[in-house]
Swiss-Prot record:
Location in the cell: Cytoplasm
Coiled coil segments of this chain: none
Full protein name: Arginine biosynthesis bifunctional protein ArgJ
Higher taxonomy: Bacteria, Pseudomonadati, Pseudomonadota, Alphaproteobacteria, Hyphomicrobiales
Catalytic activity: N(2)-acetyl-L-ornithine + L-glutamate = N-acetyl-L-glutamate + L-ornithine; L-glutamate + acetyl-CoA = N-acetyl-L-glutamate + CoA + H(+)
Length: 412
């Protein structure tokens, strides 16, 4: 089915700046939909530092298995990504397909297979024909060029309605450093130590172990704090690469005590947060972005558990879709979270409108006053538990009939 662009999409989607030493090619492999690019090949001209976080699903794809195993090598020379087929739950044939893609990519670049990383997204459980990808890789390796980030983001889309890109340019170590990132995701979004698919590249010089440390920290407040439908994918992959090709003499930083560590980490966190919000704003059928802020919990973990319980509640999400400030459903979601709360201490706001205080409806609450707020595209739900100092914020989207239509029609 044809998908309308999300009403929450960015107004302007622009190309990202080229990065020295990074070349990109896309192609039409015809994996699922004809007449669109669905294959991405990112080429690094020199050995490049690599880090990654992946799904914790017990049914991971063959691509995830390979990336996990190769990460310890600490060097990347290429990334192959296909959309339309997840190559997950495909048994021995899935492993053979992954191996064939790895061999073809490594041969095209004349590098080792454990220096190639792969990712697949799309339908689960259907065999992926390797030849449709393998035959294209040699020419893609030759024609790959700097830039092309927008095309790269388009090539990895499935039910996404817009490509997701972000960039940061900043001073670090006396040099201008750039970070580019792309992502895809609209459904099956509830990451656990990872994201849907996202690839981030910087021209900074950073050792793989430090890159891994920064990525693992930055993902917590971004991709690990979003949810569309509470379903964690079999293919969730977030990978980051550092080429060290920044102009000028930029020494590789290899320690958390390096002055650049904090600066770079802050910029990386901001970029991942921007990409994560784009994913939520493209949640299948979404019309409202929902921000859930929980304070006063016994611990930060408890606060996040409560926040996710609210953000994942179908009843809360459908109430937002109906522009109904149904705070009773928020109370329900808090109560079922399974962590310590006191019903008689709860305070709930929608935006700046306080709806409930000390365990009952606010006597000053008036339905008419909040109606205009509920028609906005960004709805903030704040809950104070009243027990401690733990706090957390997560982001979600509403649940509309379009979500059911998109997923009911996905394999048609």
């Amino acid at each position: 089915m044809a998908l309308k662009i999300s009403p929450l999409s960015p107004q302007n989607i622009q190309e990202l700046p080229p990065l020295s030493g990074v070349r990109i090619a896309t192609a039409e492999a015809g994996i699922r939909d004809k007449g669109r690019t669905d294959l991405l090949f990112i080429v690094f001209d020199a050995p490049t530092s690599v880090a990654g976080v992946f799904t914790r699903s017990k049914c991971p794809s063959a691509s995830v298995d390979h990336c996990r195993a190769s990460l310890s090598h600490g060097v990347a020379r290429g990334v192959v990504v296909n959309s339309g087929n997840a190559n997950a739950f495909t048994g021995r044939k899935g492993k053979q397909t992954a191996d064939a893609i790895l061999h073809a990519a490594a041969s095209a670049l004349k590098v080792k297979e454990n220096e190639i990383f792969i990712a697949s997204t799309g339908v689960i459980g259907e065999p992926l024909e390797a030849s449709s990808i393998v035959n294209l890789l040699p020419s893609m390796a030759e024609t790959a060029e700097e830039g092309n980030w927008l095309e790269a983001a388009r090539a990895i889309m499935t039910t996404d309605t817009f490509p997701k890109l972000a960039t940061r340019k900043f001073y670090c170590g006396g040099k201008t450093v750039t970070i580019n990132g792309i992502a895809k995701g609209a459904g099956m979004i509830a990451p656990d130590m990872a994201t849907m698919l996202s690839f981030v590249v910087s021209d900074a010089a950073i050792s793989s172990d430090i890159l891994q440390s920064m990525l693992s920290e930055a993902v917590q407040g971004s991709f690990n704090s979003i949810t569309v439908d509470s379903d964690t994918s079999t293919s969730d992959t977030l990978m980051m690469f550092a080429t060290g090709k920044v102009k000028g003499n930029f020494p590789c930083f290899t320690s958390k005590s390096d002055p650049c560590y904090e600066v770079f980490s802050r910029q990386l966190s901001a970029l991942l947060h921007e990409l994560a919000l784009q994913v939520v704003c493209d949640g299948e059928g979404a019309r409202h972005l929902i921000e859930v802020c929980v304070t006063g919990a016994t611990t930060e973990n408890a606060a996040k558990t409560i926040a996710l319980s609210i953000a994942n509640s179908p009843l809360v999400k459908t109430a937002i879709a109906g522009e109904d400030a149904n705070w009773g459903r928020v109370v329900m979601a808090v109560g079922k979270a399974g962590v310590e709360v006191d019903r008689d201490l709860l305070t709930i706001w929608f935006g700046e409108h306080r709806l409930a205080i000390n365990g009952e409806r606010d006597p000053d609450y008036h339905e008419e006053a909040i109606s205009a707020y509920m028609r906005g595209k960004h709805i903030t739900i704040r809950v104070d538990i009243g027990l401690g100092s733990g706090k957390a914020t997560v982001w979600s989207c509403d649940l509309t009939k379009e979500y059911v239509m998109i997923n009911g029609d996905y394999r048609s």
